[in-house]
Amino acid sequence: YVKGGTVTTDAAGGAGLFAYGDGTVYAADTTIKTTQDTSGGIHAAGGGKLYAWDLNVETDGESAAAIRSDRGGGTMVVDGGTYTSNGVGSPAVYCTADIAVKDATLTANGSEAVCIEGLNSLHLFDCDLTGNMSDLSQNDSTWTVILYQSMSGDSEVGNSTFQMNGGTLTSKNGGVFYTTNTESDITLKDVDITYNNDNEYFLRCSGNNNERGWGESGANGSDCDF
């Protein structure tokens, strides 16, 4: 249990707070700052559980989501706070777990806002969500929220779920929702959505030719309930 204070890391893979396996983390009113790659702000994997209240979290590295989960999944419950990621490939929320967030500000300054992979779910209630993904040559699209299956083994294959009730969704570059190589459910209610001037699409459900190998081209489409 952590209450108040500051957690800082300056090492690759140096998560701020990490719950793994049978471990459970409780944290409240704490400031967390990570600076290097693969260093999530708050992180759960291998079935770990993490509960957070009113944290101030910022990450600077690549592949360093502010709210991060990883192989083996787990449970993350977040109430209040500010979560900011600044690196490329660092969403505000990277979801390979069951994650619920309420009354929080979630901002990705150099990445998509949300990434959900495989049989996992993200539920947002009255949150302010912002993404600013760069246009990258290895991708055949640019998005703000993605639901997909990467085939990396980080998540079980299955239905990806995104729910947003209330709050705001701001897309600063590219399209809004992109789902590929998976089944997915997207549910929105009372969400104020702001598009960028170069918005490519609101919802794209398709196969892909992504250079990172998200399924086999021609057999990696999406079955989406919106």
Model-based region annotation:
Residues 1-10, 18-35, 44-62, 68-86, ...:
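Surface-exposed loop/turn motifs in large extracellular/passenger domains
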Residues 14:
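Blade-loop segments of beta-propeller domains
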